[in-house]
Design a protein with these regions (language model features):
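Structural motif
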Residues: 62-64, 155
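Rossmann-like NAD(P)(H) cofactor-binding subdomain of soluble oxidoreductases
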Residues: 60, 68-138
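Alpha-helix C-terminal capping/helix-to-coil transition sites in glycosyltransferase folds
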Residues: 56-57, 151
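NAD(P)-dependent Rossmann-like dehydrogenase/reductase catalytic/cofactor-binding core
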Residues: 2, 6, 212, 216-314
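NAD(P)+-binding Rossmann beta1-loop-alpha1 motif at the extreme N-terminus of oxidoreductases
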Residues: 1-56
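Internal alpha-helical scaffold of NAD(P)-dependent oxidoreductase catalytic cores
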Residues: 117-135, 140-237, 264-271, 277
Length: 314
């Protein structure tokens, strides 16, 4: 059993803390909002103002603070403010502590902001007196607590091997015998994977809405069209389809059908900016603006690089 401190007790923090508590860990919630603390205490959980967390002997500290946008730009002020408390907690103990970042942050934030701040303020070294891992959450707001206990994927981005092992051990009651895929990777990859997940979901919804809008313009049931496409389009049901970067889509159908339908839409008065962007990106990749490292290395060495885009009969 570990002693876990949650820094930031919103949706993610509460789902994480309550989940770890159900797994048998000793959990204390920290937040700056009194009403949040009162509700947690009423539910039977230990909850204190975040500034008192250094007094709690936690072996793991989970950062689950909001990273909102203001005027379209990400704000890290809540995270930065919390780092002072976390550093004090690290400095106050001779025991190894694991810092787990659950915030959604741009790639490089953990390495370039979080770790240097913690080392400087605590006077201790990452990888020795404390560890750092980025553990992106893929929780849905409406079912966050259930999603924590029943994950479809776990991603552990870690500064060093011990950090990764310690983090996996926290989740061991969930992972044992449940065949949940676990990805151990570096910090930047874990940070980017969270964004890629959210950006893909957003792009898929916008694609559906663009098709739905075109269907409505044409007097077609867009919901029925997307229900069919969800089963007929390989990209909908094959999770590996189109996930190898650096290759344009090709074949007999995709290039001609995308350009033909965009022209048809323009002639019919249908605005399809997402489809236009899809074609633009593909043209850039085909022109060599985006080349995978392994292809560039092969070309530099005189070898040939294999590859191909998604095609399909048509």
């Amino acid at each position: 059993m570990a002693r876990i401190a949650i820094v930031g007790s919103g949706v993610v923090g509460q789902a994480t803390g309550k989940g770890f508590s159900q797994l048998g860990h000793e959990v204390i919630f920290g937040d700056v909002k009194d009403d949040v603390l009162v509700r947690l205490r009423a539910e039977g959980y230990s909850a204190i103002h975040v500034h008192h967390l250094p007094e709690y002997p936690a072996s793991a500290i989970v950062l689950s603070l909001p990273t909102p946008t203001e005027h379209g730009r990400l704000q890290l002020k809540y995270l930065e403010s919390a780092l002072e408390v976390v550093a004090d907690s690290i400095a106050a103990s001779d025991d190894y502590k694991l810092v787990v970042v659950r915030c959604t942050v741009p790639p490089g934030t953990t390495e370039e902001l979080i770790i240097p701040r913690l080392e400087r303020a605590s006077g201790k070294a990452v990888g020795r007196q404390f560890g750092v891992s980025h553990n992106p959450e893929f929780l849905r707001a409406v079912s966050s607590e259930q999603d924590f206990l029943e994950p479809w994927l776990m991603v552990f981005g870690s500064h060093d091997d011990r950090s990764g092992r310690e983090l996996e051990e926290l989740y061991s009651p969930i992972l044992a015998g449940n065949h949940i895929p676990v990805v151990h990777t570096d910090l930047r990859t874990a940070e980017m994977a969270k964004y890629a997940s959210n950006l893909y979901n957003a792009a898929k919804i916008s694609f559906t809405n663009e098709i739905w809008s075109a269907c409505r313009h044409l007097g077609i049931d867009g919901d029925e069209v997307m229900a069919i496409a969800s089963q007929s389009a390989e990209g909908m049901w094959n999770p590996r389809y189109g996930t190898r970067g650096g290759f344009p889509y090709g074949g007999a159908c995709l290039p001609k059908d995308t350009t033909a339908f965009l022209a048809f839409a323009a002639e019919t008065g249908i605005h399809m900016p997402l489809l236009a962007a899809v074609i633009e990106v593909n043209e850039r990749v085909a022109a060599g603006d985006v080349v995978p490292d392994y292809m560039a290395a092969a070309a530099g060495g005189g070898g040939g690089g294999g590859g191909g885009g998604g095609g399909g009969g048509g």
